[in-house]
Amino acid sequence: IHAGGLRYHGAGSIVSQLLRDGLIEAQAVPQLETFRAGLLFARTEGIVPAPESTHAIAAAVREALRAKEEGASKTILFNLSGHGMIDLYAYEQYFADKLQDYTVTDAELRRTIDQLDRIIK
């Protein structure tokens, strides 16, 4: 699991339980979509969000667009976990078209899990 600048690549126990209980849902958002959402947020709110926060912003934008399509009035809440002033290099890479979307295949994931199983045993 990876979200921008996060250094903890796993799932917290509280988040995992909330997901298991059906109180939240998980979404995968491609990297380029997250940066587009981050730029939209920066331009409208005047805050450059941290790359990890852009994932939440992108999901909120998706929800807002879905509500608009449905003609529904919704309150949408997301967490802005930090500013991106120390992550400007990531934005520089985005503007230079040096970032790309990458999706791990099921086969790659299975190989990695199999390797972990051998290490742990």
Q: Could you tell me what each predicted segment is?
A:
Residues 1-47, 93-121:
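Active-site/ligand-binding loops adjacent to catalytic centers
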Residues 6, 10, 33, 55, ...:
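Glycine-rich beta-alpha junction loops
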Residues 13-16, 53, 73, 81:
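Generic serine detector
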Residues 28-30, 47-55, 79-81:
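Active-site nucleophile and cofactor-binding loops and adjacent substrate-binding regions
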Residues 35, 54-61:
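Short amphipathic alpha-helical surface patches that serve as generic macromolecular interface elements
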Residues 40-52, 62-66, 70:
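Hydrophobic alpha-helical bundle architecture
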Residues 59-120:
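Catalytic phosphate/nucleotide-handling subdomain of diverse soluble enzymes
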